[in-house]
């Protein structure tokens, strides 16, 4: 994918969510909510501080993250694939293996 986010923005590919309940029932509609986990596929250079220096981001390409899927998260289709563009501040946690 040929995309480079600016500043503190990251590109996230949403992870597929399980669409079956523990009992094997297929979930649909609002019960099959979108996942708030994804993989970082691109990162910007970092936060621009007051004196013009750049503070690198805490996340890196390949990290699995949990994010806030609300206001400020932009969904885009790039190369026929849906990705999310968000600020690093929209990321709540990094899932460690």
UniProtKB/Swiss-Prot annotation:
SUPFAM superfamilies listed in its UniProt record: GroES-like (SSF50129)
GO biological process: chaperone cofactor-dependent protein refolding
GO cellular component: a single term: cytoplasm
CDD domains named among the record's database cross-references: cpn10
Chain ranges passing through the membrane: none
Keyword set, alphabetical order: Chaperone, Cytoplasm
Coiled coil: none
Single GO MF descriptor: unfolded protein binding
Subcellular location: Cytoplasm
Assembly: Heptamer of 7 subunits arranged in a ring. Interacts with the chaperonin GroEL.
UniProt name for this protein: Co-chaperonin GroES
Species per Swiss-Prot/TrEMBL record: Klebsiella aerogenes
């Amino acid at each position: 994918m040929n995309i480079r986010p600016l500043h503190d923005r990251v590109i996230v590919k949403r992870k597929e969510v399980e669409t079956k309940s523990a009992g094997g029932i297929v979930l649909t509609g609002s019960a099959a909510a979108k996942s708030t986990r994804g993989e970082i596929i691109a990162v910007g250079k970092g936060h621009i501080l007051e004196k013009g220096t750049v503070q690198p981001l805490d996340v890196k390409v390949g990290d699995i993250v949990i994010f806030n899927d609300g206001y400020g998260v932009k969904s885009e289709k790039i190369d026929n694939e849906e990705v999310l563009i968000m600020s690093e501040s929209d990321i709540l946690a990094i899932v460690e293996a």
